[in-house]
């Protein structure tokens, strides 16, 4: 019986947004079709990201599936796939709410992998731990690309050496994206410094920050300019509001530099011509572009698709080697109602220094 091929059920359960713009558990959702170059996954755990909570209104495709981060068990393998077998464990990201593939989202009982934005879960890593990584890996890689910084080399024993310290300011250093980015920066030979609340200082330092500052401290921009000898050139804003943008611009050294945020930033706060600006857009990691409303809409790009493939090949190796750690977890057991409740916790900002993961119970 174990040798019989997997046949998807006629229906599955998924989390979606209905015609009334309400997040709803859909018990009669369709199952996706398996492409030849992908694998079919029974979802075992999912992580909830702030972006998941924003898929409403113009960002929602009614009855498309929600969810980016998943980890699960391979139940079927496409005919062109040779390196994965049924029973293997994988983790990856989905392009949620995509109108071209409405039945592919992480918040479902079954999904199929997408592009090359997935990897095999190494031994010793649980489904819950693996599910916490995909969005962080993808966003960290995109941020480094936009800052003009190279990705780590998975084969290097030591990070590359620079003639003098090259600092990167990470504003919001206790966020899930920040903790992955700081590790990757360290592995690329850069020195992260971070801002966050004092109760998360140890977390930021454990993920690579050389120094951590209380974001509420007076005259902090000047403190950082002094710490970096007025030579700070790179700033990643993981919060993205008027205060964070203004602060990052003030902390960058006299010669200017590069500012990247995780969302469109308030342009009136970007006050220095010597500082270049950009912001990350998650779906670009697939090379598929985005159909979201302006300013998020973007055409597909083969260059971005190739970058996503390269990033995930590197990051997958780093995770396997134990050199890239996940964010601290808050794990809850349950089903799709628990995912829905978790989205509300994340939307309200009720977590600090933790990634919310739901371990899905069996049918």
Curated annotation (Swiss-Prot):
Tell me the null mutant phenotype. Loss of lovastatin biosynthesis.
Which residues are listed for NADP(+) binding in this entry? Answer: 51-54, 174-177, 197-200, 215, 262-263, 280, 351-352
What pathway is it annotated to?
A: Polyketide biosynthesis; lovastatin biosynthesis
Tree of life domain: Eukaryota
What reaction(s) does this enzyme catalyze?
holo-[lovastatin nonaketide synthase] + 9 malonyl-CoA + S-adenosyl-L-methionine + 11 NADPH + 19 H(+) = dihydromonacolin L-[lovastatin nonaketide synthase] + S-adenosyl-L-homocysteine + 9 CO2 + 11 NADP(+) + 9 CoA + 6 H2O
- Provide a GO biological process annotation: lovastatin biosynthetic process
EC number(s) stated in the UniProt entry for this protein: 2.3.1.161
Gene3D superfamilies in UniProt: Medium-chain alcohol dehydrogenases, catalytic domain, NAD(P)-binding Rossmann-like Domain
Q: Provide any one GO MF term from the record.
A: oxidoreductase activity, acting on NAD(P)H
* Keywords per UniProt: NADP, Nucleotide-binding, Oxidoreductase, Transferase
**What's the biotech application?**
Lovastatin acts as a hypolipidemic agent that works as inhibitor of (3S)-hydroxymethylglutaryl-coenzyme A (HMG-CoA) reductase (HMGR) which reduces HMG-CoA to mevalonate and is the key step in cholesterol biosynthesis. Lovastatin, simvastatin and related compounds are widely used to treat hypercholesteremia and reduce the risk of cardiovascular disease. Furthermore, statins such as lovastatin were found to be anticancer agents.
Annotated region LovB-binding: where? 226-272
One short Pfam name that applies is: ADH_N
Which SMART domains has this protein been placed in? PKS_ER (SM00829)
Give the top-level enzyme category. transferase
Ribonucleoprotein as UniProt keyword: no
Name the protein family.
Belongs to the zinc-containing alcohol dehydrogenase family.
Record text on subunit structure and interactions? Each MAT domain from the lovB homodimer binds one lovC molecule to form the final active lovB-lovC megasynthase complex.
Please explain the role this protein plays, according to its UniProt record. Answer: Trans-enoyl reductase; part of the gene cluster that mediates the biosynthesis of lovastatin (also known as mevinolin, mevacor or monacolin K), a hypolipidemic inhibitor of (3S)-hydroxymethylglutaryl-coenzyme A (HMG-CoA) reductase (HMGR). The first step in the biosynthesis of lovastatin is the production of dihydromonacolin L acid by the lovastatin nonaketide synthase lovB and the trans-acting enoyl reductase lovC (called the lovB-lovC megasynthase complex) via condensation of one acetyl-CoA unit and 8 malonyl-CoA units. Dihydromonacolin L acid is released from lovB by the thioesterase lovG.
**The protein, known as:** Lovastatin nonaketide synthase, enoyl reductase component lovC
Organism of this sequence: Aspergillus terreus (strain NIH 2624 / FGSC A1156)
């Amino acid at each position: 019986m174990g040798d019989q091929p997997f046949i998807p059920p006629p229906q599955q359960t998924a989390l979606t947004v209905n015609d009334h713009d309400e997040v709803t558990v859909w018990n009669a959702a369709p199952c996706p079709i398996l492409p030849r170059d992908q694998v079919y996954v029974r979802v075992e755990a999912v992580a909830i990201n702030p972006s998941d909570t924003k898929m409403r209104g113009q960002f929602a495709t009614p009855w498309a599936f929600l969810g980016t981060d998943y980890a699960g068990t391979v139940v079927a393998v496409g005919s062109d796939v040779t390196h994965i077998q049924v029973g293997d464990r994988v983790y990856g990201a989905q392009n949620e709410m995509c109108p071209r593939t409405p039945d592919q989202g992480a918040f479902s009982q079954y999904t199929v992998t997408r592009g090359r934005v997935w990897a095999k879960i190494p031994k010793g890593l649980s489904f819950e731990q693996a599910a916490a990584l995909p969005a962080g890996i993808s966003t960290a890689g995109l941020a480094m690309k936009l800052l003009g910084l190279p990705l780590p080399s998975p084969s290097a024993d030591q990070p590359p050496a620079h003639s003098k310290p090259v600092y990167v300011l990470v504003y919001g250093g206790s966020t899930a994206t920040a903790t992955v980015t700081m590790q990757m920066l360290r592995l690329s030979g850069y020195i992260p410094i971070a801002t966050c609340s004092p109760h998360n200082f140890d977390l930021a330092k454990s993920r690579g920050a050389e120094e951590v500052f209380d974001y509420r401290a007076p005259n902090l921009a000047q403190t950082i300019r002094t710490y970096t000898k007025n030579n700070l050139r790179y700033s990643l804003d993981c919060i993205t509001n008027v205060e964070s943008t203004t602060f990052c611009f003030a902390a960058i050294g006299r010669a200017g530099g590069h500012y990247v945020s995780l969302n469109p930033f308030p342009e009136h706060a970007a006050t220095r011509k010597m500082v270049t600006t950009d912001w990350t857009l998650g779906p670009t990691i697939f090379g598929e572009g985005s159909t979201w409303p302006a300013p998020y809409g973007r055409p597909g790009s083969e260059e971005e698709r190739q970058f996503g493939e390269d990033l995930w090949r590197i990051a997958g190796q780093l995770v396997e080697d134990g050199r890239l750690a996940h964010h601290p977890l808050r794990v809850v057991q349950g089903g799709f109602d628990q995912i829905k409740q978790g989205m509300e916790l994340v939307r309200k900002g009720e977590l600090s220094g933790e990634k919310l993961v739901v371990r899905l119970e069996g049918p």
